[in-house]
């Protein structure tokens, strides 16, 4: 699997020469101490840059950030007052994501010692407001985080934003391979691929299934045997598992990954209606590739496949999978949704050691496919779907509470997860349907609604979040406003 490179984030402190060189030296020293502490807690490299105290220095720094491929984004903070007209030229040219950090070096006011020297130096309270006005006046998208720089909650929010920017950078260079077309007559999996490349950076290429079959057939027996040994070390095998069927999935896994690596594709889709030349619908093979970090979705759903790859980058490839709303449990007061798919759920969400099972599957009209069977973990999670509204893309997300499933399903040998949608089954599903949310989603225990909203903001697309505070009336109003805004 292609590993995403590590990025840097630049920390730029704003000031001005009005207070003299001694004050600027103290600003630089405070900034250095802050960055050294933050570097210990943040998930990406934080690089301190010289204090920005003139229009020329600011423009130079922003141009350098634009031209540095290792720089994923910048973090700005105004230690003293920094007149915002100094920032106009730099902000006009900046093309990297920006986080405006409203903090100050001292946590507490030194009540007995505070004087005008202290006041002149520690002016974040109005310096950051001045800077914030200019960014808003110029209509520049950015993230704002407020709080003391040593606060664990604040550091986590900055770290979460860094991860989101990584996902943004991945999106801008993402290539998706489609094996076959969409499931016939299905609407929500369709979409404008040209607009997706313009807006999201996603390059989508279609391939006949024969191109893939040729690569699968070139896989050697030795390669299959080596992968089977890996399967035995990671999973249990059902006592009735047809070993030849499992070996076929190993061959498919190697073949698909080889095809993807040759074209630098990091996401892909298949469809059970385009399997000519294949013995099985890819099941275990797809689950394994998702576990390695590839994005995937079934039935030709390239949007969800790409979204899964992007969100796996955001989540560090932990606890994140392709998902489908499968069937409802409507017991009064215990309404829940069973999420699954025919075969393809990622084992990173498993609560137990997955089991390899070979069982019949009517879809695709091929030999019985091998798949990993397991139950998902309990815990707070979310579902996210990306849909094409014709004039724009919309990201729809719903926070859920995944629960331990006490029931076995011996006649349904699939991986699954059971959840309660928030705030309730009726409110969540009604709001989801009003928003046009798809039946295919990305399910994740690791990603927050704030990160999803931040990613959508970076991409310039609409985002609807349904959480424990939502109600249908509120969501319908938001949809109404967004139709006019977009």
From Swiss-Prot:
A GO term for molecular function: manganese ion binding
Keywords: Arabinose catabolism, Carbohydrate metabolism, Isomerase, Manganese, Metal-binding
Cited InterPro entries: Ara_Isoase_C, AraA_central, AraA_N, AraA_N_sf, Fuc/Ara_isomerase_C, Fucose_isomerase_N/cen_sf, Lara_isomerase
EC number: 5.3.1.4
Cofactor binding note from Swiss-Prot or TrEMBL: Binds 1 Mn(2+) ion per subunit.
Biological or metabolic pathway of the protein: Carbohydrate degradation; L-arabinose degradation via L-ribulose; D-xylulose 5-phosphate from L-arabinose (bacterial route): step 1/3
Cofactor: Mn(2+)
Binding site for Mn(2+): 299, 324, 341, 440
Top-level taxon of the source organism: Bacteria
UniProt KW Metal-binding keyword: yes
Recorded GO CC terms: cytosol
Catalytic class of the enzyme: isomerase
Catalytic activity: beta-L-arabinopyranose = L-ribulose
A biological-process GO annotation: L-arabinose catabolic process to xylulose 5-phosphate
UniProt-listed PANTHER family: L-ARABINOSE ISOMERASE
Family: Belongs to the arabinose isomerase family.
Main function: Catalyzes the conversion of L-arabinose to L-ribulose.
Protein name: L-arabinose isomerase
Organism: Shouchella clausii (strain KSM-K16) (Alkalihalobacillus clausii)
Origin organism lineage: Bacteria, Bacillati, Bacillota, Bacilli, Bacillales
């Amino acid at each position: 699997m292609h590993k995403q490179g590590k990025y840097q984030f630049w920390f730029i402190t704003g000031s001005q020469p009005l207070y003299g060189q001694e004050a600027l030296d103290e600003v630089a020293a405070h900034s250095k101490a802050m960055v050294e502490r933050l570097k210990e807690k943040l998930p990406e490299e934080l690089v301190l840059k010289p204090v920005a105290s003139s229009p020329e220095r600011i423009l130079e720094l922003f141009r350098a950030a634009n031209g540095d491929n290792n720089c994923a984004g910048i973090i700005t903070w105004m230690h003293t007052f920094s007149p915002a007209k100094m920032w106009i030229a730099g902000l006009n040219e900046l093309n990297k994501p920006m986080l405006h950090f409203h903090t100050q070096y001292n946590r507490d006011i030194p009540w007995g010692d505070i004087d005008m020297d202290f006041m002149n130096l520690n002016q974040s309270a109005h310096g950051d407001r001045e800077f914030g006005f200019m960014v808003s006046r110029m209509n520049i998208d950015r993230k704002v985080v407020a709080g003391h720089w040593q606060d664990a909650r604040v550091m986590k929010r900055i770290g979460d934003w860094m991860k989101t920017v990584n996902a943004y950078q991945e999106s801008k260079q993402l290539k998706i391979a489609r094996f076959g077309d969409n499931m016939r007559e299905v609407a929500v999996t369709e979409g404008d691929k040209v607009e997706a490349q313009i807006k999201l950076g996603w390059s989508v290429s279609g391939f006949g299934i024969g191109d893939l079959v040729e690569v699968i057939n070139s896989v050697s027996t030795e390669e299959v045997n080596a992968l089977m040994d890996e399967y035995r070390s990671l999973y249990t095998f059902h006592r009735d598992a047809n070993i030849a069927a499992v070996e076929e999935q190993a061959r498919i896994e190697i073949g698909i990954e080889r095809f993807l690596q040759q074209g630098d594709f990091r996401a892909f889709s298949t469809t059970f209606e385009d399997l000519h030349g294949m013995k099985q619908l890819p099941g275990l093979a797809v689950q394994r590739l998702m576990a390695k970090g590839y994005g995937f979705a079934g039935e030709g759903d390239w949007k969800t496949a790409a979204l899964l790859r992007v969100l796996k980058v955001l989540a560090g490839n932990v606890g994140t999978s392709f998902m489908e709303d499968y069937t409802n449990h409507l017991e009064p007061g215990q309404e829940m949704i069973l999420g699954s798919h025919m075969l393809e759920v990622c084992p990173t969400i498993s609560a137990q050691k997955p089991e390899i099972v070979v069982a019949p599957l009517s879809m695709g009209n091929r030999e019985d496919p091998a798949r990993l069977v397991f139950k998902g973990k309990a815990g707070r999670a979310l579902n996210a779907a990306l849909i094409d509204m014709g004039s724009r893309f919309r990201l729809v997300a719903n926070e859920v509470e995944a629960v331990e499933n006490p029931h076995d399903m011996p006649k349904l040998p699939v991986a699954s997860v059971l959840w309660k949608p928030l705030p309730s089954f009726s409110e969540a599903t009604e709001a989801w349907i009003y928003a046009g949310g798809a039946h295919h989603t990305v399910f994740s225990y690791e990603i927050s609604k704030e990160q999803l909203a931040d990613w959508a903001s970076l991409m310039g697309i609409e985002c609807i979040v349904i959480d424990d505070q939502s109600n249908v009336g509120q969501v319908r109003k938001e949809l109404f406003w967004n139709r006019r805004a977009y």
